[in-house]
Structures are given as structure tokens and as C-alpha cells.
From Swiss-Prot:
MF terms in GO: ion channel inhibitor activity; potassium channel regulator activity; toxin activity
Domain note: The presence of a 'disulfide through disulfide knot' structurally defines this protein as a knottin.
Sorted UniProt keywords: Disulfide bond, Ion channel impairing toxin, Knottin, Potassium channel impairing toxin, Secreted, Signal, Toxin, Voltage-gated potassium channel impairing toxin
Top-level taxon of the source organism: Eukaryota
Name of a matching Pfam family: Toxin_12
Propeptide feature ranges: 22-29
Residues making up the signal peptide according to the UniProt record: 1-21
UniProt subcellular location: Secreted
Family per similarity comment: Belongs to the neurotoxin 10 (Hwtx-1) family. 44 (Jztx-4) subfamily.
Name the UniProt record assigns to this protein: Kappa-theraphotoxin-Cg3a 2
Role of this protein: Gating modifier of Kv2.1/KCNB1, Kv2.2/KCNB2 and Kv4.3/KCND3 channels.
InterPro entries in the record: Huwentoxin-1 (IPR011696)
Length: 63
């Protein structure tokens, strides 16, 4: 019973990881949202964000 529970949890975790990877793979051509890695070789930030030169992340523009 204990090993069945462990296998079930591991299987569920693997399923969630694979689903996340598929979702990330589909978003290759999209723009980057909040805290998205930006810079050379990365997708550009969405129009409402700017790429922070200090951190290399998409963030809200400073006033």
C-alpha cells in the first residue's frame, strides 16, 4: 500500500512536469511576461513591459 502511494505521487509529479514543459515549448514565439528572462537570444518583452538591463528580466517601466 505504501509503495503504491509513492508511485502514484511520483507519477502525478511527472505528469505535471511534462504538462509544464509542453506549455513552455508552445510559447516559444510569444512575448515575455512579467519577470520573463529577456536579452540577447531571448524573446522580447510584451508591450507593457521593458527589459531591465540590470537584471535581464521583463518588468514594469519605471516612472
Amino acid at each position: 500500500m505504501k509503495s503504491t502511494s509513492i508511485l502514484f505521487i511520483l507519477g502525478l509529479a511527472l505528469l505535471l512536469v511534462l504538462a509544464f514543459e509542453v506549455q513552455v515549448g508552445e510559447s516559444d514565439g510569444e512575448c515575455g511576461g512579467f519577470w520573463w528572462k529577456c536579452g540577447s537570444g531571448k524573446p522580447a518583452c510584451c508591450p507593457k513591459y521593458v527589459c531591465s538591463p540590470k537584471w535581464g528580466l521583463c518588468n514594469f517601466p519605471m516612472p
